[in-house]
Amino acid sequence: MLFRSDYNIVHMRREDQIGYNGTTAVSDGFRALVLLIALSEKRLLMDSFGHHAAAALNKPSTVLWIANTPVVFGHSIHNNIVANPFTKKPELRQAYLQKFDIAGNLLEFPYKNELETFNSQQVIDSLK
């Protein structure tokens, strides 16, 4: 098991996104974020620019997928983990251009709770 004292968790996020206890939030320019990726030992990334940057830097990462698919947007260098099947029908009346709002509208969340989204043991094993 990994322990918090063994590593630092850097959370790349926008200023308007929630922060998490025990992490260092970083909201910086593209170059600074790419530098963080380049210097990092391990990476847990969502389907976003981070996994593209990691692939370009030849940094294998764990990438979590919910709305998009690694078949289309992923890189074979990564351990791509696809979300579990939905456990509830999401409210998608406000969806525009793609199935889910990239901002994370809670009404569109297709699970009863966050713990159902991914196989957490698979994610942990991927980071070992």
Protein language model regions, located:
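Donor-binding and catalytic core of enzymes assembling or modifying cell-surface/extracellular glycoconjugates
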Residues: 4-71, 78-81
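Leloir-type glycosyltransferase catalytic cores
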Residues: 77-128
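A conserved mid-protein helix/loop that constitutes part of the nucleotide-sugar donor-binding site
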Residues: 1
